[in-house]
Amino acid sequence: MTGINAMAPAPEVVSWAEAVEQDNAPHIQEGADGTRTETAFTEVDGVRWKVVTQFKVINKRVPKVVADRKKWVKFGSCKGEPAGPQVATTYVAEEVDMQFTRNRAGEQILDVQEDKQTAKTTSREHCRHCKGNDHWSTHCPYKVMYQLDEEADADKDTEKDRMAMGMRPDGRQIDRNRSDENTCRVTNLPQEMNEDELRDLFGKIGRVIRIFIARDKVTGLPKGFAFVTFESRDDAARAIAELNDIRMYHMVLKVEWTRPSN
């Protein structure tokens, strides 16, 4: 038995205007996978164009805030347009997930270099030996060499100062041997500390006869050590006991007996 599929008769075209309008009307075809193909004709500057658009409607669950955002009223170039993206103002493309890889080893090297550069420009660290700004004097790799030179220069400067200042402030002669016995050697002295501050500090212990701060001959900056002479040896001993290992600025003072000149 043979079956014949009867096709619906084509609508009757009354006039040519209706034929043109029917020909220009969009035609929508829906595929098996839910994809819709819309074919339309448009005329621009006397040229007829065929526009084919494919789209697929997908229903998915979204957060409530996303759904509410789709209800916002459009503005600007999209003012008055219906919901959804518009071809004239919105370009819809595939979502691409980007993953940024990080070279941790290279970042660590860069961080160390930046830290060193920052330390050179902003650090308060300062070495009184090599004049570097990346470490303290106690961690200077040339500390031993500089200390030997400083002690040699200090002995020379102290001897000259003793010869030039052989008188007490009141004009009386100072016994050199007695002066050596009553003198304290102060090391690890901050560069910010001057003679007045040193006199105020040691003057609380007893009467100070003389204070000498060793300075660089070229720059005039303190070398980091000084000599304080008391009138009494007992005061010098108390100064060593009370002022040794106290903190001044960023340094810790070392107060001890001076070495005999002979």
UniProtKB/Swiss-Prot annotation:
It is found in: Cytoplasm. One of its GO terms (molecular function) is mRNA 5'-UTR binding. SMART domains: RRM. GO terms for cellular component: cytoplasm; eukaryotic 43S preinitiation complex; eukaryotic 48S preinitiation complex; eukaryotic translation initiation factor 3 complex. Residues 182-260 form the RRM domain. GO terms for biological process: formation of cytoplasmic translation initiation complex; positive regulation of translation. It comes from the Eukaryota. Pfam families: eIF3g, RRM_1. Disruption phenotype: Abnormal morphology (dumpy phenotype), slow growth, sterile and in severe cases embryonic lethal. Keywords: Cytoplasm, Initiation factor, Protein biosynthesis, RNA-binding. CDD domains: eIF3G, RRM_eIF3G_like. Gene3D superfamilies: 3.30.70.330. Its main location: cytoplasm. PANTHER family: EUKARYOTIC TRANSLATION INITIATION FACTOR 3 SUBUNIT G (PTHR10352). Belongs to the eIF-3 subunit G family. Component of the eukaryotic translation initiation factor 3 (eIF-3) complex. RNA-binding component of the eukaryotic translation initiation factor 3 (eIF-3) complex, which is involved in protein synthesis of a specialized repertoire of mRNAs and, together with other initiation factors, stimulates binding of mRNA and methionyl-tRNAi to the 40S ribosome. The eIF-3 complex specifically targets and initiates translation of a subset of mRNAs involved in cell proliferation. This subunit can bind 18S rRNA. This is Eukaryotic translation initiation factor 3 subunit G. The lineage of its organism: Eukaryota, Metazoa, Ecdysozoa, Nematoda, Chromadorea.
